[in-house]
């Protein structure tokens, strides 16, 4: 029997082909990650909140409302993982059209807060490698400073009231098909070859625009 429970959330389509991130992320890896793992979080979230008051809220509102609730931990985990993955896909851009340069305003902030772009990249990779077990590594704006944040499991900056600019998924399902247990190689490849720096810069610029409004 087909369920009639409302499904307020949907799996976002990728803005690029499954093969577009090759040779750094294979079509097989991306399809498994997006179509199976991400979809499972969306389906579970809909099952948990469909037809409830939470189901009428935005994803960000659900995350903030459930972040500190032990009773709603499962809802938080699935809502946050849906948000995290949706953001992660946008952090990457097809290799054939990628502009490897970092926009000037963003580069200025990175150099100011980390010393150099290379130092930032090294710290980002180190934080991801050092994340014990499953989680995410983020570039965030905390106050007026850029910082790197590693979060466990589904946790994210939205739940902590911080602005996410960039993320990399360090759950094994994000890289195991292509990199097996070589998380350092995956992280270095991500930061050197896959990041859409224009998207990262736009996240920072959007915050400034909001403040000026």
What are these regions (language model features)?
Residues 1-213:
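Feature for soluble, non-membrane regions of globular proteins
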């Amino acid at each position: 029997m087909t369920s009639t429970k409302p499904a307020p959330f949907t799996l976002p389509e990728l803005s690029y082909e499954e093969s577009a991130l090759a040779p750094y992320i294979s079509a097989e890896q991306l399809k498994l990650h997006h179509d199976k793992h991400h979809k499972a979080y969306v389906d579970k979230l809909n099952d948990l909140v469909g037809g409830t008051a939470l189901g009428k809220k935005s994803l960000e509102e659900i995350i903030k409302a459930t972040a500190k609730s032990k009773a709603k931990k499962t809802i938080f985990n699935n809502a946050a993982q849906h948000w995290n993955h949706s953001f992660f896909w946008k952090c990457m851009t097809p290799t054939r059209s990628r502009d490897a340069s970092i926009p000037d305003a963003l580069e200025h902030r990175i150099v100011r807060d980390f010393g150099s772009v290379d130092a930032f990249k090294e710290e980002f990779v180190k934080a991801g490698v050092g994340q014990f077990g499953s989680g995410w590594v983020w570039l965030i704006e905390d106050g007026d400073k850029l910082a790197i944040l590693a979060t466990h499991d589904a946790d994210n900056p939205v739940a902590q009231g911080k602005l996410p600019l960039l993320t990399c998924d360090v759950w094994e399902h994000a890289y195991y098909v292509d990199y097996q247990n070589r998380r350092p190689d995956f992280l270095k490849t991500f930061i050197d070859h896959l990041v859409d720096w224009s998207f990262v810069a736009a996240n920072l610029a959007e915050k400034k625009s909001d403040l000026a409004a």
